[in-house]
């Protein structure tokens, strides 16, 4: 058996190539030098003398053995096995010497944490080493587990965002990354890892720094998308349920559904479906917000179609109870036929119109929409026109509404815009509440003067009760209080004047001072407060006027008028003598 085959049996291919290369490159290496470092028992091999004819052959064999041993020992001591790519680095005339140098370098202690940049030839040997490959394999496994966890966390979010795939590609992982087809920023590329010049610790720190920086940037985006989708889905579900419960006709359902979807998508409005005659469940009404009940349950005069929502939790304020501008004639029936009532789904919210000799609650629609109830009525947007306050400079009563006037009025919207408060609701209310004024008119002044016959010191709450058609604010309330202050001032001036006149006439007994209807004092007061003389002054006012005159007479006769505050006791007496105001003054149309 050939000894070369025995020596080359552990690594037959690589070692044979390297042995042949070293045999061709080094013919002059000395065997005794190699024998000192050789671990193999070369002494057991029989040696030949130079005089032996086979000496040259034995010397050749020993040299080859020494070189092969050196190469094998260098391969065992090197960190990475030789590969065909860097085999040329080991094939050189100085192969044994470099192997010994590598052996000495391996014995030196080197720090494990910080790896100094090695020469180019050493990097080529270290990249493919078993330790580096093992660490790369572990790193890939960790990244693969992390990727699986992220994919498992992202799958429920993708399914929750709906079958439309709204969240696909927007979460932490895109569709390509989820399927493994696209580029993955956290997967280490083998070619890139082999070609880089960084050490292993730097690569691990870089990978660990990339993991937490990627997740927070994608998580808020996916949460925001999920939140928006859930909000939209809940809004659509609530709208559909309200429409099915509160609305019967399919035509109005389609119309209101479109308006609800358009306004809920903007996120600035709130749906408030009409509850006129279509609501059959009282529990659904109790669950509605208060502003919806106020809009839907405002009674309009004595009309039978204006159905009240009797809810003890949400009482309607008295100032929100309007009165019609003028009572309809006696020959006008206050009920509508059944076929009209069937088409009046939005009667409470969309106002009233005069149609076919009846006061009905149907919204203003053209003839085609009335013939086809399922078709969508041509509703004009309510923001295009704004109802102007009915401030009439020379008239005592607002003009009666006609059918043409009603057609030009805006309709109440299906939703109430938030952050506008009561002012926006008053502006949008239809026919029945369009009398609510932003300011005061001469009709209000006339009513206030007539109310002075009954009360001289009215409170703000009393004014709100008897002026239901006025939108009260701080300015209007102070203006009305100022009116009554002027009324009292004129009243007390006339009383003081008459008392001094009686003293100058020689009257000594205050009981003789009585205000009669034919007296000069009464004529002056009646001309000021009842200019048209179309109101009968009550007898209680004559009694209060007589008492006031007597009090002024006593104060002036006693000389108390020298005190700057001598009138205050008289004011206290008169303020306690207010009488009840008739109920007719609560009507917004009184006086005509």
UniProtKB/Swiss-Prot annotation:
PROSITE patterns: HOMEO_PROSPERO. This is Prospero homeobox protein 2. Belongs to the Prospero homeodomain family. It is found in: Nucleus. Residues 201-211 have a biased composition (Basic and acidic residues). The Prospero-type homeodomain and the adjacent Prospero domain act as a single structural unit, the Homeo-Prospero domain. Residues 437-495 form the Prospero-type homeo domain. Residues 360-377 have a biased composition (Low complexity). Residues 437-592 are annotated as: Homeo-Prospero. The lineage of its organism: Eukaryota, Metazoa, Chordata, Craniata, Vertebrata. Pfam families: HPD. Transcription regulator. Does not seem to be essential for embryonic development and postnatal survival. The gene is PROX2. Residues 95-106 have a biased composition (Basic residues).
């Amino acid at each position: 058996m050939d000894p070369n085959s025995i020596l080359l049996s552990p690594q037959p291919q690589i070692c044979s190539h390297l042995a042949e290369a070293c045999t061709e490159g080094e013919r002059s290496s000395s065997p005794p030098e190699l024998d000192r470092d050789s671990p193999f028992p070369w002494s057991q091999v029989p040696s030949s003398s130079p005089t032996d004819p086979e000496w040259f052959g034995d010397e050749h064999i020993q040299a080859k053995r020494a070189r092969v041993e050196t190469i094998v020992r260098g391969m065992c001591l090197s960190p990475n096995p030789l590969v065909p790519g860097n085999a040329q680095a080991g094939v050189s005339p100085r192969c044994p010497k470099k192997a010994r140098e590598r052996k000495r370098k391996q014995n030196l202690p080197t720090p494990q944490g910080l790896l100094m940049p090695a020469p180019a030839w050493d990097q080529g040997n270290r990249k493919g080493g078993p330790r580096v490959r093992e660490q790369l394999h572990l790193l890939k496994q960790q990244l693969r587990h992390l990727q699986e966890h992220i994919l498992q966390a992202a799958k429920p979010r993708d399914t929750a965002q709906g079958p439309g795939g709204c969240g696909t590609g927007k979460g932490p992982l895109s569709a390509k990354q989820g399927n493994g087809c696209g580029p993955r920023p956290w997967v280490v590329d083998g070619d890139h890892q082999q070609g880089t010049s960084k050490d292993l610790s730097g690569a691990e720190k870089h990978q660990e720094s990339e993991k937490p920086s990627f997740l927070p940037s994608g998580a808020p985006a996916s949460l925001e998308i999920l939140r928006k989708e859930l909000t939209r889905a809940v809004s659509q579900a609530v709208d559909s349920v309200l429409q099915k419960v509160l609305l019967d006709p399919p035509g109005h359902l389609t119309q209101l559904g479109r308006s609800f979807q358009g306004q809920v998508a903007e996120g600035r409005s709130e749906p408030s479906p009409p509850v006129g005659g279509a609501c059959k469940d009282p529990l659904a009404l109790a669950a509605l917000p208060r502003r919806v009940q106020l809009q839907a349950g405002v009674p309009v005069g004595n009309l039978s179609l204006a159905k009240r929502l009797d809810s003890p939790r949400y009482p309607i304020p008295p100032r929100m109870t309007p009165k019609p501008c003028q009572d309809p004639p006696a020959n006008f029936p206050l009920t509508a036929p059944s076929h009209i009532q069937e088409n009046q789904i939005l009667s409470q919210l969309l106002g009233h119109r005069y149609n076919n000799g009846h006061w009905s609650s149907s919204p203003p629609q053209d003839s085609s929409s009335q013939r086809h109830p399922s078709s969508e009525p041509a509703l004009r947007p309510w923001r295009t026109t704004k109802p102007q306050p009915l401030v009439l400079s020379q008239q005592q009563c607002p003009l009666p509404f006609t059918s043409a006037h009603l057609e030009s009025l805006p309709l109440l919207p299906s939703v109430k815009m938030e952050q506008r408060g009561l002012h926006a609701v008053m502006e949008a209310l239809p026919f029945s509440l369009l009398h609510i004024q932003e300011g005061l008119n001469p009709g209000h002044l006339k009513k206030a003067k007539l109310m002075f016959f009954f009360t001289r010191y009215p409170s703000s709450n009393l004014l709100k009760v008897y002026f239901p058609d006025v939108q009260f604010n701080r300015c209007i309330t102070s203006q009305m209080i100022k009116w009554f202050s002027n009324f009292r001032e004129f009243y007390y001036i006339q009383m003081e004047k008459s008392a001094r006149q009686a003293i100058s006439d020689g009257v000594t007994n205050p009981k003789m001072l009585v205000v009669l209807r034919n007296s000069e004092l009464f004529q002056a007061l009646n001309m000021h407060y009842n200019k048209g003389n179309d109101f009968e002054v009550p007898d209680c006012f004559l009694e209060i006027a007589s008492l006031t005159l007597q009090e002024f007479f006593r104060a002036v006769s006693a000389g108390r008028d020298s005190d700057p505050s001598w009138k205050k006791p008289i004011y206290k007496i008169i303020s306690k003598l207010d009488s009840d105001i008739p109920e007719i003054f609560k009507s917004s149309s009184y006086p005509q």
